[in-house]
Amino acid sequence: DPGPPPKPFAMGLGIGSVTLDGVLYNQLALRPEINIAKVGIGLDLVVYIDNEGNMRDDEWDIENDPGLLLDKILFIRYGKKTDPAWIKYGSIEGLTLGYGGLMNNYSNMMEFPSVRRVGVNTGFNIGPVGGELFLSNIKDMSRGGTVTGLRAAYTVSDDLPLAIGVNFITDANMFSGLKDKDEDSYPDVFDDFPDDSTLWNDTDGDGWPDPGHGDSVLDSLVDIDADGDNIIDAEENISDINLKATPFSLKDNTASTTGLSFDIGYPVLQSDAISLMIYAEYNTLKFPAVSTSDSSFIRKERSGSGISVPGIRSTLFGILNLSLEYRIINGSYVPQFFDQAYD
């Protein structure tokens, strides 16, 4: 059932608070959606106001940075998932592949607007065959990869609407989601100077960098007591100076995970008021062994599987979704591993 066509115009409103560059702002966002035939465009028109009533201008300095116009586009969409071909670019919300054993209600918007991910979700329906492709954030492709999902499905016939599907999901680099504002390859969570690409370590936390950052840092800026023991480092033996190790680096380090699932489902009841689906699903997750170049991250190979049988899914009046599953889990399989909070 393709459902009713989208309204020509809709408006969303967002009110809340958000932290940007370490400052807490009140947020007022207007999110209009414009639909013309099969094309839909969602916009993000937002202002940030600090606790003194000042509006943050960074997002609206379009004269000096025309690229900010692209940030106002929340998504561009062509068609719906029931059409012969469809695609959506930008924000991805509520994405489920198959019956959700691997990916359920996934969103690339959880850290929006401090992190703006640009996803792609596209697919086709040709007779009894359907396909779907998903990329979480094409910006991460240059950092080793992003979450990618594929689904293929086949429906036996209109008289026997038994649907068989296969899903493949991989995160080619689980580290690519780590923020690195200064792009020095050291994630902000490990970087003592996340806004300065020439600095990264400050053992005693006094704001002065440790030695060892290279010739780009003047000697006058280097901490003379880097380990904070109240003894000038020049007067100590090197073996007595305890400094942080070089932080974990994103450079040449990756960790992946891969999931594969098979499902079969049959619609027992389908009407405007109620729908009822029964299904079974087999899922596997694999986490290959990882050892980073500096041994700061080590993970042994792990894997697991899960079976959902039987599964029952129902929708009441188009507003209430119910599901019930009996699961058998083995090893390191985590149901709905790629969910709303994954990123």
Q: Which functions belong to the PLM regions below?
A:
Residues 22, 53, 128, 185, ...:
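Intrinsic-disorder/low-complexity loop/linker signature
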Residues 74-76, 121, 175-176, 193, ...:
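A short, hydrophobic secondary-structure junction motif
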Residues 139-179, 193, 202, 240-269, ...:
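Solenoidal tandem-repeat scaffolds enriched in leucines and small polar residues
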Residues 2-11, 17, 23-156, 161-166, ...:
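Outer-membrane beta-barrel channel domains
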